[in-house]
Amino acid sequence: MELPLGSDLARLVRVWRALVDHRLKPLELTQTHWVTLHNIYHLPPGQSQIQLAKAIGIEQPSLVRTLDQLEEKGLITRHVCAHDRRAKRIMLTESAEPIIQAVNGVISHTRSEVLFGITPEQVDELALLVSRLEKNILALHENQA
């Protein structure tokens, strides 16, 4: 009997994010907000909305509402790209810095707690296996196209 690996991985991501989300409640950020801010921070500066949507794994139109909300909070700015007037570049504002630091701190601390009792070698092996799974899935998608 095969193990439900896909379901197990999806559940793991869901409960991990829920834990981080609970710990970030004092910042009054929704999960969508902190995931978006976290991704903007870790991508090279000035990414386009399309690139950000791909990094998060959502459709670009779904991202627009979240970006509107983050812009209203003064955490990001969007600028029209000089090379493609249809594209918008996203930048974090100075006021986002303390929030980003708090989010990163909670994520890092939670990661340490979640990985308690797991050796660095085991974490590396898990990361390698997950990367291989992703590569296989992407190859299957390309073969379907």
Curated annotation (Swiss-Prot):
SUPFAM superfamilies assigned: Winged helix' DNA-binding domain
Organism superkingdom = Bacteria
Q: What happens when the gene is disrupted?
A: Pleiotropic, with decreased production of exoenzymes such as pectate lyase (Pel), cellulase and protease Prt. Has a 50% decrease in potato macerationafter 96 hours. Dramatically reduces transcription of carA, the antibiotic carbapenem biosynthetic gene.
Keyword field contains Repressor: yes
Coiled coil segments of this chain: none
Any GO MF annotation of the entry:
DNA-binding transcription factor activity
Kindly give the Gene3D superfamilies that the UniProt entry links to this protein.
Answer: Winged helix-like DNA-binding domain superfamily/Winged helix DNA-binding domain
DNA-binding region as annotated in the record: 49-72
Biological process terms from the Gene Ontology for this record are: antibiotic biosynthetic process; response to stress
Q: Write down the Pfam families for this protein, in alphabetical order.
A: MarR
Residues covered by the HTH marR-type domain: 2-135
The task this protein performs is described as:
Transcription regulator that can specifically activate or repress expression of target genes. Regulates genes involved in production of antibiotic and exoenzyme virulence determinants in the phytopathogen. Required for the expression of the virulence protein evf during Drosophila melanogaster infection.
Q: Which NCBIfam families match?
A: PRK03573.1
Q: Please give the name of this protein.
A: Transcriptional regulator SlyA
Species this chain originates from: Pectobacterium carotovorum subsp. carotovorum
